[in-house]
């Protein structure tokens, strides 16, 4: 399981593991303005869609925040959609994205594809009320901050322990705010990994609805 908070992230970016990646195709678009080369991410951005498909770290957080701010400047009254398929990541990066989501004027629809684990689960819950969604087979994982590997003098350990407790309380109050649950319930539920199906995430208050497949909707 990917931990939400790596103690090493207290001082900076959590280390990134090896990742394999499908090569995105590029394509040519013709318009009245001429010809331009594009790719799926550019096309999504033009439709005011942000896709978070990697771990939450300084690099991905900066990318997401930049897109949020640009889309707000282009049109603050149009919704922004954030698709999420992420194993989670660092606390500071999570809160940077979270604060930016709350800062911009546009409503933000969050949609879970695959998984929203750990930090990504908080971002999923932080979407605008009534606009937090997931596909039927998506899963959501919430848990407490990780504590392993802390070293140093006693005074350093006390400082790090206090910071981990502060982060845990902040995570609990943030989830409580967006789920409607008491922070004490969140603390109990995140004492161990809590894995939720899309339907269970709706019942828990992390999302508002489970999406139907578009094919099925069209057949009705």
Swiss-Prot record:
Its domain of life reads Bacteria
Biological processes per GO annotation: protein quality control for misfolded or incompletely synthesized proteins
* GO MF annotation, one: ATPase binding
Q: Which UniProt keywords apply?
A: Cytoplasm, Hydrolase, Protease, Serine protease
List, alphabetically, the GO terms of the cellular component aspect. cytoplasm; endopeptidase Clp complex
Instruction: Give compartment(s).
Output: Cytoplasm
The record ties this protein, via SUPFAM superfamilies, to: ClpP/crotonase
Its Enzyme Commission number(s) read 3.4.21.92
Q: What class of enzyme is it?
A: hydrolase
Matching Gene3D superfamilies = 2-enoyl-CoA Hydratase, Chain A, domain 1
Annotated function: Cleaves peptides in various proteins in a process that requires ATP hydrolysis. Has a chymotrypsin-like activity. Plays a major role in the degradation of misfolded proteins.
Its name, as the record gives it, is ATP-dependent Clp protease proteolytic subunit 1
Write down the species: Rhodococcus jostii (strain RHA1)
Q: Gene encoding this polypeptide?
A: clpP1
